[in-house]
C-alpha cells in the first residue's frame, strides 16, 4: 500500500526551516526538547482564540526567544502590552532562562494550512455540512492567491455508520517538487458522532532562491490574485474513498 512522505519534513533545509533553532550538548538535549514541548503545549492552550499558526523557538546564549505567528496579534499583545509581558514571565518560568516574545502577524490567513484546517474543524464541530465547509475553504484560499489547495476529511461524515474519506481539490498541488512552497497541516474535529480528521495542503508558488530566499525574503508589493486557467488551474476535483461501500442514504 503506497504511503506519502510528510510534505514539510521532506522540504526541511530546502525551502522550509525548522520550528526550533538551537544547539545543545547530549546531556542537555532531552531537557531542552522537553521544555520546548511544554512551551508549545502551554501556548496552544492559552492562545487558542488567537489563531496561532506557528511557534518558532530560538535559544541564544543564556536566553530564549519565542516567535509567535498569529492572525490576531491584538489578542496576544493585549491592552497596552499587558498580556505579552505576562506571557514573557510565564515562559521564563517554564524555560528557566529569560524569554523574549515577538509577534509575527499573518496577513493572509486563508493561505495558512493550519488556520484553514482549524476553520474547517470548527465548522464541523458546529454541525456545518462537511462538503460546504470544504468548498468554502477552497474558494477562500484560491481567492486569496493560492496556486492550488487540497482538503481531505475522514471519519463518520454526516453521521454515517461507516467511516470514509472524501477530498476536494482545486488548482495544482505538486507534492514531488521540492522547490514548491507547500504548506500542510492536520486537525481533529470532535463531533457528537466521533472524531473527524482534517488535512489541508496549500500550494503558494515556487521558491527558486532556496533557503536564502526563505531566511531573507524580498519585500513584494501586494497585488490582486490572478485567476488563470493554465495547467491544472481553475479545475475542481472531488474524490471519495471508503473502507466498504457507503450506505445507500449517503
Swiss-Prot record:
Pfam families associated with the record: KH_2 (PF07650), Ribosomal_S3_C (PF00189)
Region of interest called Disordered, as start-end residue ranges on this chain: 214-250
Record-annotated KH type-2 domain positions: 39-107
GO cellular component: cytosolic small ribosomal subunit
SMART domains registered for this protein in UniProt: KH
UniProt GO MF annotations: mRNA binding; rRNA binding; structural constituent of ribosome
InterPro entries the UniProt entry points to: KH_dom, KH_dom-like_a/b, KH_dom_type_2, KH_sf_prok-type, Ribosomal_S3_C_sf, Ribosomal_uS3_bac-typ, Ribosomal_uS3_C, Ribosomal_uS3_CS
Basic and acidic residues bias (residue ranges): 220-250
Ribosomal protein recorded as keyword: yes
Gene Ontology biological process terms, A to Z: translation
Family label: Belongs to the universal ribosomal protein uS3 family.
Summary of the function given for this chain in its UniProt record: Binds the lower part of the 30S subunit head. Binds mRNA in the 70S ribosome, positioning it for translation.
Subunit architecture: Part of the 30S ribosomal subunit. Forms a tight complex with proteins S10 and S14.
Protein name, per record: Small ribosomal subunit protein uS3
Record lineage: Bacteria, Pseudomonadati, Pseudomonadota, Gammaproteobacteria, Moraxellales
Name of the gene this protein is made from: rpsC
Amino acid at each position: 500500500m503506497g504511503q506519502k512522505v510528510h510534505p514539510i519534513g521532506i522540504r526541511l533545509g530546502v525551502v522550509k526551516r525548522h520550528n526550533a533553532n538551537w544547539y545543545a550538548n547530549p546531556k542537555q538535549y532531552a531537557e531542552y526538547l522537553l521544555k520546548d514541548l511544554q512551551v508549545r503545549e502551554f501556548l496552544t492552550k492559552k492562545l487558542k482564540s488567537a489563531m496561532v499558526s506557528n511557534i518558532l523557538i530560538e535559544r541564544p546564549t543564556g536566553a530564549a526567544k519565542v516567535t509567535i505567528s498569529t492572525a490576531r496579534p491584538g489578542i496576544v499583545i493585549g491592552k497596552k502590552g499587558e498580556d505579552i509581558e505576562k506571557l514573557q514571565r510565564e515562559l521564563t518560568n517554564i524555560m528557566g532562562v529569560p524569554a523574549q516574545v515577538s509577534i509575527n502577524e499573518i496577513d493572509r490567513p486563508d493561505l495558512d494550512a493550519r488556520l484553514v484546517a482549524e476553520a474547517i474543524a470548527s465548522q464541523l464541530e458546529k454541525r456545518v455540512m462537511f462538503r460546504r465547509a470544504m468548498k468554502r475553504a477552497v474558494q477562500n484560499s484560491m481567492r486569496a492567491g493560492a496556486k492550488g489547495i487540497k482538503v481531505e476529511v475522514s471519519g463518520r461524515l454526516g453521521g454515517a455508520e461507516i467511516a470514509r474519506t472524501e477530498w476536494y481539490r482545486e488548482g495544482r498541488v505538486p507534492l514531488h517538487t521540492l522547490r514548491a512552497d507547500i504548506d500542510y497541516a492536520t486537525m481533529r474535529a470532535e463531533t457528537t458522532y466521533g472524531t473527524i480528521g482534517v488535512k489541508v495542503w496549500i500550494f503558494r508558488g515556487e521558491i527558486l532562491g532556496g533557503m536564502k530566499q526563505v531566511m531573507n525574503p524580498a519585500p513584494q508589493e501586494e497585488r490582486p490574485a490572478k485567476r488563470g486557467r493554465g495547467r491544472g488551474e481553475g479545475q475542481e476535483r472531488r474524490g471519495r474513498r471508503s473502507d466498504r461501500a457507503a450506505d445507500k442514504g449517503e
